[in-house]
A protein has these predicted regions:
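N-terminal maturation segment of proteins
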Residues: 1-452
Length: 452
């Protein structure tokens, strides 16, 4: 992934890349030191979250340096570099990868096989860490930037699940489906018409959605980012264990565009009806728009433009999904159900994450709750639950952040009436970058008061 985020037009670009590769052994040594410190303190991950790790490491190692992903920038080099220099750089790359990178990854693989994985625990909750619930409380506060406790969040999640479930049921009635909620979900999961057969067709679909979204942005925003973005597939080595999609922001110097990465592995778990909501979240008006604007802010110090609070960033991404109807999306009931399914997914996170780490739910119990209430594929649900197990509290940030933004929008509409301008509201919300939710609330309330 490092190579995909760099430009390789000149010799010095390749040399800069090699200088980074030379630091891989140090990086892995530091990682091993941190993992061993965690082991000494009793912080070990559940075994289920380490499944597939050895295969992932092995895919990085290989035997021939030229067959590794690290060598990809040297396989086909640009004509702007003369042949003699190309040969020099290729030989240097083979040496660096063979003598430094591959041995470091083999060392990491041996550590995981012989020291780490054998000691992995068979429990899932934070309750079984040395500091127990105190640790989960810290994780929750850190990711949500609020002081809500686990049961408050759990109850908010239950309330949101009930609200969204009612809206989903209305869509089921609209399409005149004969059967209950579970039967409709099974229909969505098994009817081949809801899925693509060709990975390129899936990517083209996302690109089309993004083009349509681009055209609608001026109706909702006064300021738009200069940085472009594109759609790519998640690399093959990563895709089987990866999520449905993610966004990689452009580098601060603007030398590369931002990238919306879509998973083309196992197309039968990538339904068409979720594509609009997903693209709006990851690209525009979601992560690309927000993060690119933040990167381009000129009135802030650099550390502010590169700081990210999950509740703000992911709250904005989820809020962006709700803008789809105003942008001309979700026009058919199945796409609307897909948007509701994605909102339900984030609401379920409040229930499931707290259920696992505060109430001590089993992995299967968490999976069952998600299966019963969402249209996500079984593969996606299992991947998601394993993520919640291994990353306590992070998944809470999405819905909590979105709820705060929605509350601020409703407050502004109510108080400002005819003076409310959604473009000005969005511009002000985004103009100082990512921040804790309490600070965001204070800023937006001041903006509302100043416009009364």
């Amino acid at each position: 992934m490092l190579a995909s985020r760099m430009s390789f037009e000149r010799s010095r670009d390749h040399e800069a890349y090699l200088s980074r590769l030379k630091q891989v052994p140090r990086y892995i040594d530091q990682t091993l030191e941190m993992l061993r410190n965690g082991m000494e303190l009793g912080f070990l991950p559940p075994a289920v979250t380490l499944e597939g790790v050895i295969d992932q490491i092995s895919s990085q190692v290989g035997s021939d340096p030229q067959q590794t992903l690290f060598y990809s920038p040297f396989g086909s080099m640009p004509s702007t570099i003369d042949e003699q220099d190309q040969t020099r750089l290729q030989n240097l790359a083979k040496t660096v990868i063979g003598d430094q990178v591959q041995p470091a990854f083999r060392k990491f693989k041996e550590f995981m096989q012989t020291e780490y994985i054998p000691l992995a625990r068979d429990t899932f909750a934070c309750l079984y860490y040395p500091t127990g619930s105190d640790y989960y409380g810290h994780c929750s506060r850190r990711h949500t930037t609020t002081h809500m406790n686990a049961m408050e969040i759990h109850k908010i999640g239950q309330s949101e699940v009930a609200r969204i479930r009612k809206q989903m049921q209305q869509v089921i009635s609209e399409v005149e489906f004969e059967g209950d909620f579970a039967a409709f979900i099974e229909h969505l999961r098994t009817d081949s018409s809801f899925y693509h057969d060709d990975p390129e067709e899936l990517l083209r679909g996302y690109r089309d959605i993004c083009k349509r979204a681009d055209a609608m942005l001026p109706h909702l925003f006064g300021r738009l980012p200069r940085a472009p973005y594109g759609v790519r597939k998640i690399p093959d080595f990563e895709a089987p264990r990866s999520t449905t999609a993610y966004y990689r922001p452009a580098p601060p110097d603007g030398s590369q565009p931002g990238w919306f990465y879509a998973n083309t592995h196992d197309l039968k778990s990538r339904p068409r009806y979720e594509m609009e909501a997903l693209a709006l979240h990851e690209a525009v008006p979601g992560h690309h728009l927000q993060l690119a604007l933040q990167n381009e802010l000129e009135n802030l110090p650099r550390w502010r433009t590169t700081t990210h609070f999950t509740a703000y960033t992911e709250g904005w991404g989820l809020y962006s999904e709700s803008l789809g109807e105003a942008m001309g999306f979700y026009q058919d009931p199945y796409s609307r159900f897909g948007q509701l399914s994605y909102e339900m997914w984030r609401a379920l996170r409040l229930v499931v994450d707290t259920g696992i780490h505060h109430l001590g739910w089993s992995r299967q119990q968490a999976i069952d709750v998600m299966l019963e209430n969402s249209a996500l594929s079984i593969k996606n649900i299992e991947s998601e639950v394993d993520r919640y197990i291994s990353w306590p509290g992070q998944a809470l940030a999405y819905k909590i952040g979105e709820l705060v933004i929605q509350e601020l929008v409703q407050d502004a509409r109510s108080k400002l009436g005819q003076r409310f301008d959604i473009r000005s509201f969005h511009d002000h919300l985004l103009e100082e970058g990512s921040m804790p939710l309490d600070l965001l609330r204070s800023r937006m309330e001041s903006w509302i008061d100043s416009n009364l």
